[in-house]
Amino acid sequence: MHPRFQTAFAQLADNLQSALAPILADHHFPAMLTAEQVSTLKNTAGLDEDALAFALLPLAAACARTDLSHFNVGAIARGVSGNWYFGANMEFLGTTMQQTVHAEQSAISHAWLRGEKGLAAVTVNYTPCGHCRQFMNELNSGLDLRIHLPGRAPHTLRDYLPDAFGPKDLEIKTLLMDEQDHGFTLTGDTLTQAAITAANKSHMPYSHSPSGVALECKDGRIFTGSYAENAAFNPTLPPLQGALNLLSLNGYDYADIQRAILAEKGDAALIQWDATAATLKALGCHNIDRVLLG
C-alpha cells in the first residue's frame, strides 16, 4: 500500500478495510475502481452507492499534493460505465497558481483520460468552487450531473450553477467526454506517438489548438494528458496537468519523470510550449521535447 493511504485506510470500517486491502496492496494502485470492484465493496460493507462514495472520499483526498495550501480536497467521479475515478487537488511550487489542478478537475480528467464516456455523479468533500462548477458545465452530462457533498442532500449541477453560461451558448455540439479523434498521423518513437495520440483526443472547440503531453517514468511507464478547453476559457485544463495528475494518482512522484514530450501545432492560436517547459523544469524534469502536429 502506498504510504499516503495508511492514515485514511486505518479509519475505515473493518469490513471495508478487508475488502479494500487487496486492491490497495499495489504501490501503484491506479486510484480507480472498476464497476465490479464497486459492487463487491457495496455488498461487503453493506453500503449503498452514495454511502460508499462518502466512505472512500478520505482515500481520494489522500492523493492531494498541497505543498502551498495544505488543504486536501478529494473527489470521486462516478462514470456511466460504473467505474469510479479518484481525484485530488494539486499545487506546484516554483510555478504559478494558475497551474493548480482542482480536485473535481482531477477526478473528471482522470475519468476522461481513461476512456470514460460520461459521468453520472461527482462526490466531493467540500463544496465545488465556481471554477469547478464552470469546468463541469463543459461535460456531456451537462447540468444534470449529480453533485454529492457530505451532510447535504444531493443536487444537480443546475442547482449549483444557475443561469449557467456554457458551450451551448456558443453553439458547440461536441462536449468534453464525447469521443474525438483529430486524425494527426502517429510518427516517432513510443513516447512521441503517445503525445500525438493525446493531442488527437483534445477538446479544443474554441481555439482549435490541439495539444497533448506524454511523460515517461524511469520504470518505462507512460502517462498522457490531453488539452481540455472550457467555454469560459480560464477553467481550461492544460495537457501537462492532465498527465501530471494521472502520474501522481498512480503513486508516482515528479522525480520519477525521465522524459517529456509535448505535441502541438506550431502555428496554433494558443501555444503550450513555454508554460509546459517552465512547469516541468520547476518540477525537476529537463529532458523535454516538442513534436509539431502536421
Swiss-Prot record:
Zn(2+) binds at H102, C129, C132. Signal peptide: none annotated. Keywords: Hydrolase, Metal-binding, Zinc. The active site is at E104 (proton donor). Binds 1 zinc ion. InterPro entries: APOBEC/CMP_deaminase_Zn-bd, CMP_dCMP_dom, Cyd/dCyd_deaminase_Zn-bd, Cyt/Deoxycyt_deaminase, Cyt_deam_dimer, Cytidine_deaminase-like, Cytidine_deaminase_bacteria. Its cofactor is Zn(2+). Residues 48-168, 186-294 form the CMP/dCMP-type deaminase domain. The keyword Zinc applies. GO terms for biological process: cytidine deamination. Substrate binds at N89, M90, E91. It catalyses: cytidine + H2O + H(+) = uridine + NH4(+); 2'-deoxycytidine + H2O + H(+) = 2'-deoxyuridine + NH4(+). One of its GO terms (molecular function) is cytidine deaminase activity. The keyword Magnesium does not apply. Its EC number is 3.5.4.5. GO terms for cellular component: cytosol. This enzyme scavenges exogenous and endogenous cytidine and 2'-deoxycytidine for UMP synthesis. Homodimer. Belongs to the cytidine and deoxycytidylate deaminase family. NCBIfam families: cyt_deam_dimer, PRK09027.1. This is Cytidine deaminase. It comes from Salmonella schwarzengrund (strain CVM19633). The gene is cdd.
